[in-house]
Amino acid sequence: MKVMVYEPGHPGELREIDNTLAACQEVVDGYIETMHLTGELLIVCNEEGRLYNLPRNRLGICGTFFVCTAAGEDFDGLSDSQVEYLRKTVR
């Protein structure tokens, strides 16, 4: 699935990742936690980022996070227009 990955101190990067729990955990380097960014966009981050003092990132999140969408109870990839929206708004 196509996601935007945000690492502390680096610009957002468009990546293709597998839509599996293991792949999501690998990106955030730990257990995942989700939050709504907008009605359709989800932030997926490390649920223990603050506990482990991971570097502070955008939006007050600690550690690497990515943005995707939801398809029911599953994650889904971003559309081209969603990628453009994120490139303009999440810096």
Task: Outline where the language-model segments fall.
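Short beta-rich binding modules
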Residues: 1-91
